[in-house]
């Protein structure tokens, strides 16, 4: 859950987001070390009067500054490729939910059930109850079972949208005529908020997403009441 003046990432709720957080810290450490080294070299060049104007060739130095960046790029690329593979891999999903973007709301269809589908609109500020979040609450939440792999099929009816829930490490483009997929797995119950992350028109800012992750028993009761 995000909070005012937050400086870091949202708390990870899925295995993918945990991996992304660790990768962020790993990459940030490498960038910090490189930046410190470059600033140190620049400071030496500005403060020292020692120069090598007669140096015409330095094969050892050239070898080092060719190999070292390649090694650093490999250290960044390998964990990145691993996470990309994890995000694309979907094995035996327990549930499939089709998400369609519209100007300016989302519609959801639980494809494993015959008549379980609904539209999800933002609740206007004037209709909010005490404790509800402005521009983030919806009239119909997406209820999903926790601790189970869920496949989200994402597309659009009109223009480009993007279905994003930061605490779950999700951001998938909704493209007209194309069906993208993502995996949702939550480690704990709760409400998780997101928004459309692709500028899609004048009301782009009013397309919130709310996932309600519940135990499997509660999800079965909810789905039975919705059919």
Swiss-Prot record:
Residues bearing the modification Phosphotyrosine: 218
GO molecular function: copper ion binding; cytochrome-c oxidase activity
UniProt cofactor note: Binds a dinuclear copper A center per subunit.
Record field: transmembrane: 15-45, 60-87
Swiss-Prot/TrEMBL catalytic activity: 4 Fe(II)-[cytochrome c] + O2 + 8 H(+)(in) = 4 Fe(III)-[cytochrome c] + 2 H2O + 4 H(+)(out)
Record's protein name: Cytochrome c oxidase subunit 2
Entries under InterPro entries matching the protein: CcO_II, CcO_II-like_C, CcO_II_C, Copper_CuA, Cupredoxin, Cyt_c_oxidase_su2, Cyt_c_oxidase_su2_TM_dom, Cyt_c_oxidase_su2_TM_sf
GO aspect biological process, one term: ATP synthesis coupled electron transport
Quaternary structure and interacting proteins, as annotated: Component of the cytochrome c oxidase (complex IV, CIV), a multisubunit enzyme composed of 14 subunits. The complex is composed of a catalytic core of 3 subunits MT-CO1, MT-CO2 and MT-CO3, encoded in the mitochondrial DNA, and 11 supernumerary subunits COX4I, COX5A, COX5B, COX6A, COX6B, COX6C, COX7A, COX7B, COX7C, COX8 and NDUFA4, which are encoded in the nuclear genome.
Domain of life (superkingdom): Eukaryota
Cofactor(s) this protein cannot do without: Cu cation
């Amino acid at each position: 859950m995000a909070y005012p003046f937050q400086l870091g990432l949202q708390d990870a709720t899925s295995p993918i987001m945990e991996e992304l957080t660790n990768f962020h810290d790993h990459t940030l450490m490498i960038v910090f070390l490189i930046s410190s080294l470059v600033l140190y070299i620049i400071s030496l060049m500005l403060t020292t009067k020692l120069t090598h104007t007669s140096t015409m060739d330095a094969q050892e130095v050239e070898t080092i500054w060719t190999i070292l960046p390649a090694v650093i790029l490999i250290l960044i690329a390998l964990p990145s490729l691993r996470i990309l593979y994890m995000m694309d891999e979907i094995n035996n999903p327990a549930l499939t939910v089709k998400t369609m973007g519209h100007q300016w709301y989302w519609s959801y269809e639980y494809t494993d059930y015959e008549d379980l589908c609904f539209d999800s609109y933002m609740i206007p500020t004037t209709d909010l109850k005490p404790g509800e979040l402005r521009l983030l609450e919806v009239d119909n939440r997406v209820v999903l079972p926790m601790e189970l792999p869920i496949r989200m099929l994402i597309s659009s009816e009109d223009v480009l949208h993007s279905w994003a829930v930061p605490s779950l490490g999700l951001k998938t483009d909704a493209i007209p005529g194309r069906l993208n997929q993502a995996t949702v797995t939550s480690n704990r119950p709760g409400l998780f908020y997101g928004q459309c992350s692709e500028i899609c028109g004048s009301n782009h800012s009013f397309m919130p997403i709310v996932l309600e992750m519940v135990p499997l028993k509660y999800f079965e009761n909810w789905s039975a009441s919705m059919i």
